[in-house]
């Protein structure tokens, strides 16, 4: 796709697409401040917080990116019944994201990542999370929500897996098989080396390390050695297209019939890489 074609797709075609994002929803919180002294209580810096920012994270960030492009985005997952859930709801409302598939659970907390920033330096990250599969009473709720979306008409599904429990083997396979029956493409943002649960998906977007682990081979980050591992991973798990991110080398796509395409990267100075993989 040439630059002009890509621009036309982003401005005209994508705006009417209905995309469901299923996965691990998170809240990212940033505490920005200045560090000018060491605490008298312990040998640690004191951060004088000046500003707090909350943003959608994990699968929620994927939905936010889609909404920003003009898609009708639907989010499915599970959060706690807590104040951080309310922050997420407010941001979903503002972004125009449908969160009717976001289960509110009294048995877990909303996954939250708190980052402490001094000037432009991230000093510390605090994670608040309880990892666990969907509860027996939650799975039917997710299935019913997804079935209604299929009946209404979906253009695509994204499974955003952060290994927090929503994207279990059985649930991923049910989503993929149902989507295949409706001829709805499925894109996977994977976690870990066990890709069997993603079998039958249309696209998967690992980084180079994840792809090598899934294929059981380590290769240098160069075009020639990367392509065969692409092909092997794709065929091993029955995934139609593999799009691997390669840091400063850009991205490489390998699809059916040995189709391949490389997109180089543009170097930029980055202070916070969180959310970069979701954006891909």
Located regions from the model:
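Short pre-catalytic strand/loop immediately N-terminal to key active-site residues, enriched for Gly-Thr
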Residues: 50-54, 264-275
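Positively charged, low-complexity intrinsically disordered leader regions
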Residues: 1-36
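Short acidic, glycine-rich surface-loop motifs adjacent to enzyme active sites
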Residues: 150-166
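Structural motif
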Residues: 20-22, 125, 155-158, 187, ...
């Amino acid at each position: 796709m040439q630059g002009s074609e890509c621009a036309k797709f982003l401005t005209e075609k994508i705006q009417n697409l209905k995309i469901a994002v299923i996965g691990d929803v998170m809240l990212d919180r940033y505490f920005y401040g200045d560090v000018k002294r060491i605490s008298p209580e312990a040998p640690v810096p004191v951060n004088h917080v000046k500003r707090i920012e909350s943003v959608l994270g994990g699968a929620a960030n994927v939905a936010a990116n889609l909404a920003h492009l003009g898609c009708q985005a639907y989010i499915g997952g599970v959060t706690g019944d807590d104040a951080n859930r309310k922050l997420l709801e407010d941001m979903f409302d503002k972004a125009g994201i449908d969160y009717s598939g976001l289960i509110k659970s009294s048995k877990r907390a909303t996954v939250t990542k708190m980052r402490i920033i001094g000037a432009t330096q991230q000093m510390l990250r605090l994670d608040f999370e309880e990892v666990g599969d969907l509860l027996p009473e939650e799975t039917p709720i997710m299935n019913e929500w997804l079935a209604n979306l299929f009946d209404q008409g979906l253009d695509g599904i994204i499974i955003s897996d952060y290994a927090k429990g929503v994207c279990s083997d059985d649930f991923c396979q049910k989503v993929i098989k149902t989507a295949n029956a409706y001829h709805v493409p499925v894109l996977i943002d994977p976690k870990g080396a066990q890709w069997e649960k993603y079998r039958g998906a249309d696209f998967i977007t690992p980084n180079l390390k994840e792809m090598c682990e899934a294929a059981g081979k380590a290769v240098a980050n160069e075009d020639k050695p990367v392509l065969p591992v692409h092909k092997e991973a794709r065929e091993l798990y029955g995934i139609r297209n593999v799009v691997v991110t390669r840091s400063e080398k850009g991205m490489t796509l390998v699809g059916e019939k040995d189709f391949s395409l490389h997109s180089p990267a543009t170097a930029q100075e980055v202070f916070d890489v969180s959310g970069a993989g979701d954006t891909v």
